[in-house]
Amino acid sequence: ARTKAALQKNPKNVLLAVCWMQGEFDMSAATYAQQPDLFTAMLKQFRTDLSGFNAQCHGGSAAVVPWICGDTTYYWKNTYGTQYDSVYGAYKNRESDNVFFVPFMTDGNGNNTPTNLPAEDPDIADAGYYGAQSRSNGNWVSSNRPTHFSSWARRGI
């Protein structure tokens, strides 16, 4: 509904891509194996719903607007290995559908990408960055800190 509203609001608006960063909590559900089919159905419905805006879509068609599906932290893969392979594996090898998987779990050197664990997300006061180290239950994203990436870790992408 938001995408449609944005396209309706201004005919100069163009949908370039969809950035999809979801799936973590699907892994902890008993129904995790249904997620790949549900994702495909959602993708098809989204594209159908926006077909009236083809002229405002990258490539001239809602059917070819790229979906960029981002990875999650290593916590989820370590905790829910089978489920991770089912949910996140469904985003992989779908280039023919214009669905692209972006691995974020490790950096360019193969090291685990830092999470919101205080030891992995220190404050860098000289840079004006206050990470998980200075956060408490009043201002953190989740009490399960390794489930989210450090904000500093993903800069520059």
Q: Model regions: which residues?
A:
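Cell-envelope and extracellular/periplasmic
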Residues: 1-157
